Amino acid sequence: MPSYGSLHSPSLRKMEHSRGQYGGGRKGMSLGNVIGDPFALATISIAGLAWLIAFIASIVAQIQTTQGFPTYTWWTVVFYFFLIPGVFVVVASDTIQTYHVALVGYMACGLVLTTSSVNGLVYSTNGAKEAAAAGFILLSMVTIVWIFYFGSAPSAMPRAYLDSFALSKESTSNNRQTMTGGGYGIGRPETSTSVQPPQMYTSAQLNGFENPSPVNGMRNSGAPPSGFPTTPGPASGLPKTTTPPAGGAADAEIVPPTEYPYRAKAIYTYEANPDDANEISFSKHEILEVSDVSGRWWQARKETGETGIAPSNYLILL
C-alpha cells in the first residue's frame, strides 16, 4: 500500500489529473436519478400535471369561446411541452452543472409566458378559462422554485439540504469501490471547480537548500558563509545534491501540511477507498479542517486528528 504522499499514490494521481478527468466520460440517462431525488420527482410530476390541466382546459375554452381566447396561451403550452421534458432529461443524465445556466434562462422566459397567460385567463367567468389559469398558476409556482434551485450554487445551504435527500447522490460513495486504475472520479458527482493543485516538492528535490547553522552564529563568525567557496576549486563550497537512484523518487515522502485555516462541513457521508491509504472517511454534517481549497480533492483533518484527502464536492466551506 503506498505511503502517505507517495508520488505513485492513487490520491496524488487523482489530484494531478483532475483537470483531464473532469468531464472525461459521458453519463447515460438513468431513471433512478429522478426517482431517487424527491425534489426532482415532485416538481417534475407537479409541472407535468399542471401542464396537462392547462392544455386540456385551453382546448375546451377555445371550443366554448371562439373569440376572446388569448392566442399566445398556445405558445406557452408549446414552450412548456419542451421545457418540462428538458428538465427531466438533464436531471436523469446528471448534467445539471453543465446545463443549469441554459435551464435558468429558459425558465425565466417560461415564467413570463405563464404569468401573462394567467393575466389573460383568470378574470374570465368561463370555467374552462379559469381551469387553464389554475394550471398556469401552478406552472408559475414550479418555475419559480426551479429558478431558485438551478440558479443556486451546489454549496448553497438550501440546495445542499434538498440534495441530501437524493438517494442517487448518497449511493455514489458506495459505487466508487468498483473503480480501478484511471477511473477515479468518473462516478462521483461533478463539480464546477477544477483548479490545478499547487506544486509539491520532495525532500530529494529540496536537498542542499537547508541551512544547518544558526543565523546568529553566521553573523558572529569570521568565516564566510557555507554557500561560498573558501579556496579555488571546482564548486568546493556549493551545496551537495544527491541524485536519487532509479525508483527512489517514487517512494519519496511529502510532508503533510501543518496549518488548516479553513473549516468545512460534510453534506454527504463518504467512505474512503480501502485501496488508498490517503483518503479519509467522514459522516454527514461532520466538521473538517481544510488546508487547501484548490482542486477537486482537499487536504483535510478530522477532529480526531486523522488527516487525508477528501472530495471537495462532498464538503461546503463554513
From Swiss-Prot:
It is found in: Cell membrane. Residues 1-23, 172-255 are annotated as: Disordered. Pfam families: SH3_1. The gene is SHO1. Belongs to the SHO1 family. Residues 1-38, 93-100, 152-318 are cytoplasmic. Induction: Expression is significantly reduced when PMK1 is disrupted. Residues 259-318 form the SH3 domain. MSB2 and SHO1 have overlapping functions in recognizing various surface signals for MAPK PMK1 activation and appressorium formation. While MSB2 is critical for sensing surface hydrophobicity and cutin monomers, SHO1 may play a more important role in recognizing rice leaf waxes. The chain crosses the membrane at residues 39-59, 72-92, 101-121, 131-151. Residues 190-214 have a biased composition (Polar residues). This is Cell surface sensor SHO1. Gene3D superfamilies: SH3 Domains. Keywords: Cell membrane, Membrane, SH3 domain, Stress response, Transmembrane, Transmembrane helix, Virulence. Disruption phenotype: Reduces only slightly appressorium formation and virulence. Residues 237-250 have a biased composition (Low complexity). It comes from Pyricularia oryzae (strain 70-15 / ATCC MYA-4617 / FGSC 8958). PROSITE patterns: SH3. Residues 60-71, 122-130 are extracellular. It is a multi-pass membrane protein. One of its GO terms (cellular component) is plasma membrane. Forms homooligomers.
